[in-house]
């Protein structure tokens, strides 16, 4: 008699929520359907957009017969790593001037987070210290919890961030949680365009946050997925990270080029490491090299070449900034148009938070019953939390979406 399958006891895992939402949208035959769940940019025709500068650079790379398909170094394409770190830290960064910055090319922002988490679990504040508390914002991108948990951290906590009543930042709660966190705790911070709320601290609020973190010896691990994409201004979107560096912090920053280059399926990321001196950064990179070797061994070249070529060429860099601003401006327009329509309809509640938030996502404040009504009755797909992707809005569906939200809020207050 044959034994049962070795996998007979494997339970069915629940689907990843955002991808389940996309599948449900795809299978829905209703012509009115609107996808506000997708985590990617869309044009006003609801289509993906390949940036014109990316098309140009892809052709340039294809025509360069000196390039080949040999393995990249374990830590990645050197030009990409340096360009990526320079982009987030700025040309005049004291850390760059003092040669105490390193970079690790990764498989997207998630890969950068994972390499950083694996390193911290092995080497942060001692060796194999996985009992160090890791704090993530409440709410946060769901992968933050999963990545640090998979890296072996046993004490993952949340810090207060979103004030549901005022639909804005809970600064006092945030500061109190910083004050009460054990010294040397790790804090995952969103550099800009907080996901899912779209609500960021002001520069003055960031200064207060940094002051407490400095006094309490807390380690900042920034997640920068939207530089340039949030406000349309590369410098503004990196302000918090640069301020922390100017204050003498050692820190990690996970960078993603999925959104601001539109390179979603190329998986282009970088982990920027800022240390106190050159030698310590070299030692950190030597350990990260070991981690990468047993994780993906060597990163892919195409996306990194596209980013490095663009960032290192002044003309292409200028064109890219224009492309990024095109995306950011469309999102800002959709925010103001949605708010205007809801206010014109006299939809119950206040809607100013829609234009006060920035980036791809808006935390609408819609409750679960309202969301359920929108999905089931109106075929408008959004996350159960009420988070919507502003890129899913177009001049063609704005009226329908606003009217539907008005109905949902009026029916289920």
Swiss-Prot record:
Gene source species: Rattus norvegicus (Rat)
Gene Ontology molecular function terms on file: carboxylic acid binding; L-aspartate:2-oxoglutarate aminotransferase activity; L-cysteine transaminase activity; phosphatidylserine decarboxylase activity; pyridoxal phosphate binding
PANTHER family from the UniProt entry: ASPARTATE AMINOTRANSFERASE, ASPARTATE AMINOTRANSFERASE, CYTOPLASMIC
Protein family: Belongs to the class-I pyridoxal-phosphate-dependent aminotransferase family.
Protein name as annotated: Aspartate aminotransferase, cytoplasmic
Cofactor names: pyridoxal 5'-phosphate
pH-dependence of activity, as noted: Optimum pH is 9.7.
Subunit relationships: Homodimer.
Keyword Transferase part of the UniProt annotation: yes
Reaction(s) catalysed (UniProt annotation): L-aspartate + 2-oxoglutarate = oxaloacetate + L-glutamate; L-cysteine + 2-oxoglutarate = 2-oxo-3-sulfanylpropanoate + L-glutamate; (2S)-2-aminobutanoate + 2-oxoglutarate = 2-oxobutanoate + L-glutamate; 3-sulfino-L-alanine + 2-oxoglutarate = 3-sulfinopyruvate + L-glutamate
Residues noted as binding L-aspartate in the record, renumbered to the chain: 39, 141, 195, 387
Enzyme class: transferase
